[in-house]
């Protein structure tokens, strides 16, 4: 079990939250996908879940992480420097204790020539897809309870991708992974952690659903439509109410200005006071009405106001002979 309680991850250089108030319990055997746009903190969350004690200087965390898992493996998006100079022989027959029966069985499934395990070829000389395949073979033959994968579907051919999908589906291990590949997500995930940056990418929104990816996407789309429609209805009703209220107020104001009867004036003043109180109540109600849902901006481009150049300023001088 991996339990997160009110976890917040803050990027101190950008002065923004990447993850806000995330509470979640991940049970043995769950397949958890972390999704979101580039720069939203997916890899940072993966790092924090692996080890909250050895983080980059620019990350700070609040909240609590507890786990009953004793060992984990991590396959990053890019090949680690420490592996680039290792030979295949050193990697597969070095210090790590591997289940060699499983290793050779998986190699056969992946059509990876098992004779290459004793090769002096360096891992850094392999293609991106082969390097990932080699890391998968190695880590799946170690006795890890928890597996972290950062963009595992990148660089893989279709046959290996199909194999990886089936492996994740059938593996008894708990697997947390990052992916943008929608079909891969649909075939593998049973829990979604969605990291979003809303309000011009100034506010973090962290969503957790114990659903497959397709069900989650359909639910999000339906909720977005329903909230948009409800917000539009609320705004129309508020506008209609306020227009009626303003007409009544204008009538009372006109009567107040024109009346010469003190008794009538007092009554009109009381009515005006009541109308002003009513107006404040309408405004408070408006604040609690359904708001339009935020659609995340993918690219963070915001320009400050531009100062026009002087008409006399020379920008380009082209001299043609």
What are these regions (language model features)?
Residues 31-37, 43-105, 196-201:
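ABC ATPase nucleotide-binding domain signature region
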Residues 136:
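Hydrophobic anchor residue at the start of the ABC signature
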Residues 147-151:
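Catalytic Walker B motif of ABC-type/P-loop ATPase nucleotide-binding domains
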Residues 1-11, 98-102, 112-121, 219-321:
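Coupling and communication elements adjacent to P-loop NTPase active sites across diverse families
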Residues 179-180:
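H-loop/switch region of ABC-family ATPase nucleotide-binding domains
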């Amino acid at each position: 079990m991996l339990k997160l309680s009110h976890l917040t991850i803050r990027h101190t250089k950008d002065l923004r939250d990447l993850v806000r108030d995330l509470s979640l319990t991940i049970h043995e055997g769950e397949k958890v996908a972390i999704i979101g746009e580039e720069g939203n903190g997916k890899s940072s969350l993966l790092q924090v879940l692996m080890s909250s004690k050895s983080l980059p200087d620019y990350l700070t965390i609040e909240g609590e992480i507890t786990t009953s898992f004793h060992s984990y493996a991590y396959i990053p998006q890019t090949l680690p420097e420490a592996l680039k100079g290792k030979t295949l022989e050193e990697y597969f027959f070095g210090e790590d204790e591997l289940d060699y029966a499983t290793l050779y069985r998986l190699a056969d499934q992946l059509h990876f020539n098992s004779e290459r395990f004793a090769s002096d070829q360096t891992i850094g000389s392999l293609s991106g897809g082969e390097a990932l395949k080699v890391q998968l073979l190695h880590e799946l033959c170690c006795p890890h309870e928890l597996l972290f994968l950062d963009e595992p579907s990148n660089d893989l051919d279709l046959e290996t991708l199909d194999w990886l999908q089936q492996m994740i589906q059938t593996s008894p291990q708990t697997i947390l992974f990052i992916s943008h590949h929608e079909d891969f997500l649909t075939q593998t995930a049973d829990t979604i952690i969605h990291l979003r940056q809303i309000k011009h990418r100034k506010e973090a929104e962290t969503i957790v659903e114990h659903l497959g990816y397709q069900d989650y996407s359909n639910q999000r789309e339906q909720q977005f439509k329903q909230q948009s429609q409800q917000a539009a209805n609320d705004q129309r009703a508020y506008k209609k109410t306020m227009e009626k209220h303003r007409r009544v107020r204008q009538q009372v104001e006109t009567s107040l200005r024109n009346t010469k009867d003190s008794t009538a004036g007092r009554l009109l003043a009381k009515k005006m006071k009541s109308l002003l109180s009513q107006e404040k109540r309408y405004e408070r109600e408006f604040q609690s009405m359904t708001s339009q849902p935020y659609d995340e901006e993918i690219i963070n481009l915001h320009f400050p106001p531009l100062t026009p150049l002087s008409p006399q300023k020379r920008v380009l001088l082209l001299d043609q002979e």
